[in-house]
Amino acid sequence: MDRISNLSDDLLLKIVSSLPTKDVVVTMLLSKRWKFLWMMVPKLRFDDEFELEPSYYGRFLKYVDKSMVLNRAQVLETVKFNVGPCCSSEDIATWIRIGMVRNMRELEISHCEGYFREHRSIKLPKSLYTYEKLEVLKLASTVVLNVPIDVCFPSLKSLHLVCVEYKTKKSHRRLLSGCPVLEELVLDKSYNSFHVRSFYVEIPTLQSLSILDTSGELYGDFTFVVNAPALKYFNFVDFYGDLCLRDNMPEVVDVNIKVIYRNPKKLLGPLKSVKRLSLCLSPSTTLHNHMEFYQLVHLELCGDALMWWDLLTWMLQSSPKLQVLKIYECKCEEHDYLDDPIEEHWEEPSSVPQCLLFHLNIFEWKYYNAGDEEKKVVAYILKNARQLKTATFSAASYLYPKEERSRELNELVYMARASSSCQLLLD
């Protein structure tokens, strides 16, 4: 305790700021010096632990009120609320207004109403929508967005909308248009987006975009239109949504896409500058003319998707500078809902792809099943990848006994390798 007391106030504040606010308050019992130090903490985190009993929630309410009113930090860097069904819009509005007076920079609200109570969503106060100092806003679950026409977040750089409710069809578009310097957007349409079937993300300053469907809604028919020319990171995981990328994205570097899509060429066209690409993609059309991903050096493909053989060949032909190729199985349940697949056969490219001849140096296959077509792919890559340094294979343990897995993997040792320095790693 004496050693801690010798630390500077600034360092102590950094330490206690990482704790839940209820634990921070307890520190005032440690010494006279700490009695008022907790009031200067710039990060406040409140969690009612999904309290269902109104009387206990009343205590939590008073505790939050007191903690926020007594706080003396010049700037509240973070204010976070994780609340359950007893919390009301009025409670949240009061706390938000106090936070705005205290120059709040980041606001996070997660509200879970509970399945056994009447629907009680959280509505945000209108004054928040024109708060000029907010830099980060994260909203989750049953939070309603009723966005006014005059919405303006001139400082907002990060926005997370996870399973929120949109009051009108215009709410999301109006909100995004009021964020002129937004750099990061996370959008999860699960459960509560029934008013909105078409999402428009048209933000010239956006650098990072994640569009998710964590619930895996099969009744989909959602359309996402993205126009973000400054985008560098793009993550799209929605097997039943439709994605339209407008114009080229010359700055994009890292892309992860999981979707059932009819035309991969149309989907990936605006992403030609990508350097790292992860695909769980089920094309429903035959891929012919290849594209040119001149900067692509790292590719990950899901070997669990329908017609992935064609996609593999197409990507090898389209990626002349590819250095890393990883094949995996994502075990997505969504693949179970596809029509019965036709029997697939892998066909070798008409000519050896440039990436195999000159650049590929890492090849990895996770959950290798040692099927006939898989063996053809492995044999072809090992036979033609002249610069290959490592080839790593791990067997699908859920399908075969250990002895059989070892036997299948050991067969790879006898396959011809174009690279004399290639190291074969078997797991």
Swiss-Prot record:
The highest taxon in the source lineage is: Eukaryota
Q: Which Pfam families match?
A: F-box, FBD, LRR_At5g56370
InterPro entries, per the entry:
F-box-like_dom_sf, F-box_AtFBL13-like, F-box_dom, FBD, FBL13/AtMIF1-like, LRR_dom_sf, LRR_FXL15/At3g58940/PEG3-like
**Domain FBD intervals:** 345-395
Positions of the F-box domain: 1-53
Provide the disulphide bond pattern. none
Indicate what this protein is called per its UniProt record.
Answer: Putative FBD-associated F-box protein At3g50710
Question: What broad taxonomic lineage does this protein's source fall under?
Answer: Eukaryota, Viridiplantae, Streptophyta, Embryophyta, Tracheophyta
